[in-house]
Regions:
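Peripheral (non-transmembrane) domains and long loops of multi-pass membrane proteins
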Residues: 1-9, 66, 71-74, 192-301
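Alpha-helical transmembrane cores and adjacent cytosolic helix/loop segments
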Residues: 1-214, 300
Length: 301
């Protein structure tokens, strides 16, 4: 799975280079703020794709002495950095757009067939990139790749806004270009807000919604578990870490308790195959412990 993640991230980086160069050349030739904004956006995409590639390579490294829980946080940090780049892009676009909207001498960009072709090409590339990234992200649980996929889905919408701006300029509406640039910025900010929340939640070890309750139900269904004291879950990149404290009959042999904790771990992994599960067993108090009669009727060995 890690090889697939690296492969799709590397492909995304290569296409980011192609799009950045193409948009920059056409933007300078036509003088379109919309295309130049897209060129800057693609340049930041290039940086983000590089960060993502580095992150998925690092996150695949096994746990070591200094990182006993693995390197999955590289992916969460990558998503956070990409979000900051999206915000910077939006701020620059909004500033340049308002400058042109306030300039009465602004005559609009030079329109040409090249402007329409390069943005159409960008939409085609971003559509294929986002689909590939989203597919691998779903299969591997990679937040970094998912962030990249959402990023490029927003690029499709923003590129469509640029096409509208170029079309307006061709029809004698010069203000259409900076207005389209504002649309680009707003779309990017909208996506950035969602990404920054999710990446910060992961970096701060916020429990994934509903997962702790589901794990608790699975553990409670295991024969031999008398009580579930606590369930703590967190994510580290694509990995889920679960810590479970259960109460067992303290009058049973240690081998029996070990067997129960093994089945608790198996029950959690049935729903979350890639989870790293830690189970701690505590004995029930004497008043809570099952009677000898209950133990004799227990089907467990």
């Amino acid at each position: 799975l890690s090889d697939r993640k690296v492969q799709v991230a590397g492909s995304s980086l290569l296409w980011a280079v192609v799009l950045t160069a193409t948009k920059l050349i056409v933007g300078l030739f036509t003088g379109s703020l919309g295309i130049l904004a897209e060129a800057l956006h693609s340049a930041l995409d290039l940086l983000a794709a590089g960060v993502t590639l580095y992150a998925v390579r690092q996150s695949a490294r096994p746990a070591d002495r200094d990182h006993p829980f693995g390197h999955g946080k590289f992916e969460n940090f990558s998503a956070f950095v990409e979000t900051l780049l999206l915000v910077l892009t939006s701020v620059w676009i909004l500033w340049e757009a308002q400058e042109r909207l306030r300039d009465p001498a602004f005559a609009g960009p030079r329109t040409s067939v090249w402007g329409f072709l390069v943005i159409g090409f960008a939409i085609w590339v971003d559509w294929h990139r986002s689909r590939a990234l989203a597919r691998v992200a779903r299969e591997t649980g990679s937040q970094a790749l998912e962030a990249d996929a959402l990023h490029f889905q927003s690029d499709i919408l923003s590129s469509a806004a640029v096409l509208l701006g170029l079309g307006g300029a061709a029809l004698g509406l010069p203000q259409a270009d900076p207005i389209a640039a504002v649309v680009v910025a707003l779309v990017v900010l909208h996506v950035a807000w969602g990404l920054i929340r999710r990446s910060v939640h992961a970096l701060l070890d916020r429990a994934p919604e509903g997962v702790a309750d589901d794990v608790r139900k699975r553990v409670q269904a295991v024969t031999g578990v008398e009580e579930v004291d606590s369930v703590r879950v967190r994510t580290s990149g694509p990995d889920l870490h679960a810590e479970v404290v259960v109460r067992l009959d303290g009058g049973r042999p240690l081998t029996w308790a070990h067997d129960v904790t093994d089945r608790v771990e198996a029950a959690v992994k049935e729903g979350y195959p890639e989870a790293r599960v830690t189970v701690h067993a505590e004995p029930l108090s004497p008043a809570e412990a099952p009677s000898e009669e209950d133990r004799e009727t227990d089907s467990l060995p």
